Structure formats: C-alpha cells, structure tokens
C-alpha cells in the first residue's frame, strides 16, 4: 500500500471531510458541541474544526475534547498541499475516522481554503459548516469545492436572508447539521462554467461531482474546451460523450 493509500485510509476507503468554522463565542454552545460530536463520530467522515486559538483556553480544550468524543489540537496548517500529506497530527484521523481539531484565526480564509483545496487534492468531498459564523464572502464555494450551511439556532430574519443569498443553508439543530452534512458530502449541487474556470486556474484536470450534481450545459462546453473529465466520489470517471 502506498503512502497516499495509507494516508487516506486504504484503497477501499471513501473518506469525506466536514470543515467546521466555529465563531469564538459559540465554542461552548451546547448545539455546536453536539453537532461536532455527531459529525466527528460519523463513520467515513473526518471533521476539521477552525477557531481562533484565543477562544479555547487549556481547561476548555480538555472539556471540548471530552464533549466531542476526542480531538487533537494543532497549530495552523502549512500552505503547500504536498506538505500537508505528511504534516504530523493533522490529517492522521482520516485513516481512522477520528476527529481533528485545528486552531487558527477564526477569519483566516486562506487557511480555510487550504483545507478545502486539500480535500479536493485528495479526491474527498467537503462540506463547510459554520457554527455562529457569518461569512462575508464564500470564495471556496464559488470555486465549486463544497457546500455550506450555518448552525444558528437564533438567527434573525434579515441575517438569515443574507446568508441564503450567499447560498448558505440555515440549520437550527444538531440533527439538521448532521443530516445536511451527509447530503452535502455527495457533491456540489450545481457545477457551472465559472466553477470549471476555477478548477482550471488551479491546474486541476478532474471535476469531482456527486450522483445528484447538476452539470450545466455551459459547464460541459468548458469541460470539452479544456479537455477536463468528470469524476464521482465512487471513483467512476467518464468521457463527456458518454
């Protein structure tokens, strides 16, 4: 078995990643903890959590780890995807369906995007869950690399409307968060021409989709033009004339 196979959990493994963005004051909220516990113990799912390091003092780290069923606290990730493959302690849980907890600045979009790009680099679907976190932009979603929702039990109407305009679903309970993540990990809802352009800029030749993904006609035009292929999480790859 190659290093890559060992890293992603073996040749037959189909690992998936949920990237949770936890706003500082939501770290200890019961709904957030329960959502992370459910997602972190879902077979075949690796949970990576981003939060500001100042938000989690040592005593809360221990309490948080116990609440979510165990996790590893690490520093911010390196930017090079190749370096991430061997970065100790961060993605080791991918092989064991465990839980990884990464500390970073809560608004560090570059770090979040690196996590999403790493998942795409390894061929893993990714879902992005915000817990009390209201994004001002969603570049990783515009690139077609994941689906997003926010767990916000007390979201008020105007804020909810703005989030929905960004294509971000509002979730109210841990159960809704778990159900959403399982659906989202099947792949993006729609792949359009702009997403294909984003893949091309990053030098990717394959576009990962799920069984329920809609590929627009303009996206097919781009795929043919760029000589790219579609690939599902089930490892099926097909030519565009099939």
Task: For the regions a language model picked out, list residue spans one by one.
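A cross-family phosphate/adenosyl-ligand binding-site feature
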Residues: 1-175
